[in-house]
């Protein structure tokens, strides 16, 4: 059995397929997706279709067990669907137009109920194998246990405060994404696996990263769309 985490996909369906092929996962394996499945990239609907297939394969025992965490972009999409105040404008300026374009059909935006339901059941945080998985990070002023006992969804989805902070209060290593890095960040109590697959046009970025745990072995594939 292997435990993997996969970083921010951001609509890069072909890149995700290449990474999954590279990992050669079995039904005995476990995979935690760090969130941000949609926005900015060319094929957000196809990414969600792929994740739904992985979920179905896991339920049938034909694929690895999967945990799909929620990212801030996934939350923005849900807020838009729910008609939350200012949700469209916030989503629009954060890459949501690429996602909406993928759902255009006959001049209308048609988002499948299965995609909405999938995002609605994504948790914000997950513990497994001696690691805590979360999209953005945790509050560095509190221990990991305190963060989990008093969860702050906005911190889990949006924070970057931990990246330059003293993490001495964190008693458990945290695996996150959200903030793109040219290389995976690998510290004793922090792993960041967002290597900016969707930012392939920027120097140093443009790979999708997985990490195998607890070995901390990184697997990266270049952007393919």
Cite the ranges covered by each PLM segment.
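Detector for methionine-enriched segments
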Residues: 1, 76-77, 97, 104
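Short coil/turn segments at beta-strand junctions that form active-site/ligand-binding loops
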Residues: 1, 27-30, 64-65, 124, ...
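Acidic, His/Gly-enriched loop-helix segments that form or flank divalent-metal centers
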Residues: 93-192, 196-206, 213-224
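Core catalytic region of metal-dependent phosphoesterases/phosphodiesterases
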Residues: 2, 6, 11-89
């Amino acid at each position: 059995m292997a435990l993997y985490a996969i970083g921010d996909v951001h609509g890069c369906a072909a890149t995700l397929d290449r990474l999954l092929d590279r990992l050669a996962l079995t039904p005995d394996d476990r995979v935690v997706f760090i969130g941000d499945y949609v926005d900015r990239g060319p094929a957000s609907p196809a990414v969600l279709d792929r994740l739904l297939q992985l979920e179905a394969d896991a339920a049938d025992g034909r694929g690895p067990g999967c945990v799909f965490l929620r990212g801030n972009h996934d939350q923005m999409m849900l807020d838009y669907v729910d008609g939350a105040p200012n949700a469209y404008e916030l989503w629009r300026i954060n890459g949501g137009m690429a996602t909406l374009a993928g759902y255009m059909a006959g001049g209308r935006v048609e988002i499948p109920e299965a995609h909405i339901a999938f995002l609605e059941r994504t948790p914000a945080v997950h513990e497994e194998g001696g690691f805590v998985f979360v999209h953005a990070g945790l509050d560095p002023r509190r221990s990991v246990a305190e963060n989990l006992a008093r969860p702050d969804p906005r911190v889990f989805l949006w924070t970057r405060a931990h990246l330059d902070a003293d993490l001495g209060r964190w008693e458990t290593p945290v695996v996150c994404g959200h903030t793109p890095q040219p290389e995976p960040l690998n510290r004793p109590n922090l792993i960041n696996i967002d290597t900016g697959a969707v930012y392939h046009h920027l120097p140093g970025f443009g790979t999708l990263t997985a990490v195998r745990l607890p070995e901390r072995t990184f697997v990266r594939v270049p952007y393919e769309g």
